[in-house]
Amino acid sequence: MIFPSHDSQAFTSVDMEVGNCTILTEFILLGFSADSQWQPILFGVFLMLYLITLSGNMTLVILIRTDSHLHTPMYFFIGNLSFLDFWYTSVYTPKILASCVSEDKRISLAGCGAQLFFSCVVAYTECYLLAAMAYDRHAAICNPLLYSGTMSTALCTGLVAGSYIGGFLNAIAHTANTFRLHFCGKNIIDHFFCDAPPLVKMSCTNTRVYEKVLLGVVGFTVLSSILAILISYVNILLAILRIHSASGRHKAFSTCASHLISVMLFYGSLLFMYSRPSSTYSLERDKVAALFYTVINPLLNPLIYSLRNKDIKEAFRKATQTIQPQT
């Protein structure tokens, strides 16, 4: 990646000189605020959010793993979603916390690529997993008598494995395509993590091919998963409308309400960030959108799936009784 040489008094960087150009070896992540007075406050806020997110998601994973009453397809998918959210927030938050307590805002080229790659793995995998969860809810509501046979252990495992495989393959294409670009100007990224949009803004090469490849990868994944979710929920809605009793309709809807909220939060923030025309591009708005799907969504998902879930509440109650010292 080629940068013209430039002087910087605020930051120092390690570059390799080749001819009259400089090969970049690191980026500078500005984060949320350059004001040093805000750094302790931001550190405290993000540390609190990080600890709550980790504890919430790992509690769900452990409960689903250890309680035999939660060994069902629905909770199998919820457990994998919680693991993804645990992974997602861990890709970004430690670097955010480190930048809040250190004046060194640098991230190596390899570190930037790794951060983009692993964030893409989680994002793409979650797209596929949410579609698989919609199919699970479709099978439970539309064909309840055949549900156990339809959502077999082999099928559930295959859907989750396929989600991860698709996530890794898409992430490889996304990351490799991004880092084939040449960048010009200062190596300063006005963001709190290495994401494709701010990197593309720094590119000094023609991004037409990049945009076509990225549109194909992102477009296929997002549109295909949204289409699968929409088809599932149209069938679910039709099945609910055929239920005669109000209590039956309420119970059927409540089984998929949490998933529907999670879908709207995740895809809403992604579409807000990536579907807007370039003329309306704003780094500040992108920071807010990125903060939502990288930090807020993983924080909210454990609450969404557990607050009104009697099975998880009961499993948590039994777990706390088990670990309490006998008196």
Swiss-Prot record:
Topology relative to the lipid bilayer, per the entry, is:
Multi-pass membrane protein
This protein's UniProt keywords: Cell membrane, Disulfide bond, G-protein coupled receptor, Glycoprotein, Membrane, Olfaction, Receptor, Sensory transduction, Transducer, Transmembrane, Transmembrane helix
State if NAD is listed as a keyword.
no
List the transmembrane segments. 44-64, 72-92, 114-134, 153-173, 213-233, 253-273, 287-307
Q: What are the recorded GO MF terms, alphabetically?
A: G protein-coupled receptor activity; odorant binding; olfactory receptor activity
Under the heading Gene3D superfamilies, the entry gives: Rhodopsin 7-helix transmembrane proteins (1.20.1070.10)
Q: Which residues form a coiled coil?
A: none
Q: What intrachain disulfides are recorded?
A: C112-C194
What this protein is called in its record is Olfactory receptor 9G4
Its organism's taxonomic lineage begins at: Eukaryota, Metazoa, Chordata, Craniata, Vertebrata
